[in-house]
């Protein structure tokens, strides 16, 4: 897909805020409800288009799409594909965010972004999977939305914090 040319009025559709944290994510506790984008995305995208929005950043929820290593959740793959088709129908360019706030619990168990080996091995697989699933339907990518905020979870451990910042910069 080719992005539109010229200025754009854009918006953000955050996976965490729209859907709530995934049960398979690193966010502990009871999943919080989202804002109903799950079932009303077509209406929401139509409204955005009517308001003149021509581009959005849409967060991919890694923990929803890949709740276990090597396993893709087909229901979530289909849901994201439908959102992308809806955006295209409404003339909205989509830029996918590969990481916004949360990661799968299994990636967190491996050390998450504070572990160079886990990041170097598992992050590229996620990037390749996302590109394979959705690459032909998007205008561009945001690899890491907030690397400094992501690394802040290790602020209590200066070594891990530094490692996370480096690994996030490389990712």
Where in this protein do the model-derived segments appear?
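Glycine-rich anion/phosphate-binding loops
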Residues: 31-42, 70-82, 114-129
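Active-site region of glycoside hydrolase catalytic domains
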Residues: 1-19, 81-85, 89-171
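A short, mixed-charge helix-start or loop-turn motif at secondary-structure junctions
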Residues: 26-30, 65-66, 112, 158
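N-terminal carbohydrate-binding accessory modules
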Residues: 1-53
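Aromatic-lined substrate-binding rim segments of carbohydrate-active enzymes
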Residues: 45-102, 168
